[in-house]
Amino acid sequence: EDVKEELKNYRYIYVWTGNDYLVYQSNPDYRKYNMQKYLYRLSADFQQILNIYEIPNWITQMAFIDDKIYISTKNVYPKKDGDRVIGISSDDYGIYYSTDYFEWRKLDFEGYDLIEFRNQLFVGNNLCFNDDVIKILYETYSGYPKYKVGQYLCEIDYRNEYKTDNNTVLAFSNDGIYWAYMIVDKANIQGISELGDEILIQKDYRNYYACNKEEVFSQLREKLPNNPVYVKFNDDILGFDEPPIIEDGSTLVPMRFLFEQMGADVEWDSETQTATATLDNKAVTFSIDNVNARINNKPAKMDVPARLINGKTMVPLRFLSENMGYDVDWDDDNRTAIIK
């Protein structure tokens, strides 16, 4: 009965599982930093505590994928000046998962921002599969996805080049890899949500701006690929600013970010639209819209030429990678080019 009374406290978050509720404390109590923490299972009618589970630490976020529950945790403890509490500190961040709520396994990764999207778990700039963590290397995107709006992940991008003191840049993605940006002529935005046919942009606890959801989604469908191609480089996923495309069976990717990962130097002649990439003792020269190339100053021919798309030089992935000394495989099921 004491626990049932405690769960009436406003500091608890209730998560509906489809049959009952999982309940955890939303505002960690620093006074209990060295005590056992718990997760509660509550009946659908709120009348019965079905189970009490021990958890590794205070829960900050929760997600369900297939038969697993994932929790983001942290420890909160008092910061003291002598015997006087002068603040609150937190540390020991971790991501755990369980299939039975009793035994928890920790991901070998230090992080705390998690979100489930399309049955995948994103932790910061990482994609997690059970015990495996795949890092996403973004070309310029610098945020962590925190919101879900319809079929899109969303984030407030504070470091975007178009951010000013008088606006807010919102980043949207339909896969967590490639992002499109929308500028909102409002400053100090605190959060994003949706209600019916509208997207709500929260300025503070009382004030919201509303915009038509379908108008926003229509713009995003034009900017983001519907059937994207992915690139893995040394087991990391590359989050290009301009998503790769396929032309006549060849994958074209943004030149500069790919070569940066390889450690290659690139020289660009804007007058002739010709690039030369150099890595160790290898040099490849090619031009926009021209299948003729040179490898170590010897003539060669590409299956498709490099293209200039939305200001990005897009180059044939296999030709450039293999001539830089890398192997390229194609995962047809996941539409992924794998460079090693």
Each model region followed by its residue ranges:
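Blade-level signature of beta-propeller repeat domains, shared across WD40, Kelch, NHL, RCC1
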Residues: 190-222
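Short coil turn/linker residues within repeat-based beta-strand modules
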Residues: 46, 101-103, 133, 176-178, ...
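A short beta-strand motif characteristic of beta-propeller blades
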Residues: 2-5, 48-53, 104-107, 134-138, ...
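Short beta-strand elements that form the blades of beta-propeller/WD-repeat-like
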Residues: 11-15, 20-26, 31-32, 68-73, ...
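Primary recognition of N-terminal secretory signal peptides and signal-anchoring hydrophobic helices
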Residues: 217-340
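A detector of repeated loop/turn-to-beta-strand junctions in beta-rich toroidal repeat architectures
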Residues: 34-36, 90-92, 166-167
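Conserved Ser/Thr-centered positions that define the repeating blades of beta-propeller domains
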Residues: 42-43, 98, 130, 173, ...
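Repeated scaffold domains used in trafficking and secretory/extracellular systems
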Residues: 3-17, 56-66, 109-119, 140-150, ...
